[in-house]
Amino acid sequence: DHAGGLRVLLKSLNCPVYISGATRDAYIREKPSLTNGESQKRADAIRNRTVEIDSGKDFRIGEIDFHPFSVPHDAADNFGFVAEYCGVKVATLMDFGCITTLIKEKLTGCDGIVIESNHSRDMLRACAVYSWDLKQRILSRSGHLSN
């Protein structure tokens, strides 16, 4: 999710991009709002720099083991991660709409947990700027966790 700035970021960083195939495809796919060949620019920016990851397959970066898992969100192939180093486990979950049985299982035994929750249900409902459709999407089980 939120990979829109990746192309610009990669201009100043020389690093691999760990990304699922579905997320990569969604990132490259041109949206009607993207013009001037942005889709091709995105494809060029990540060419030969991606390491494909999967929610069911652990991977390692340096000495840190990563245990990815699927989370419910309305974007292409969203993951949470448990990172483990020397027996210490820290979980990160950014965009997800609800806590599932799988999430509970993955968080069990973690030494630290970082969770993004970015709205108050009452404030969101009262917000005059957001459309009702957007509010419903945010509040859904595949939207965003409330505070």
Show which residues each predicted segment covers.
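Short hydrophobic/aromatic-enriched beta-strand-loop microsegments
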Residues: 16-21, 49-53
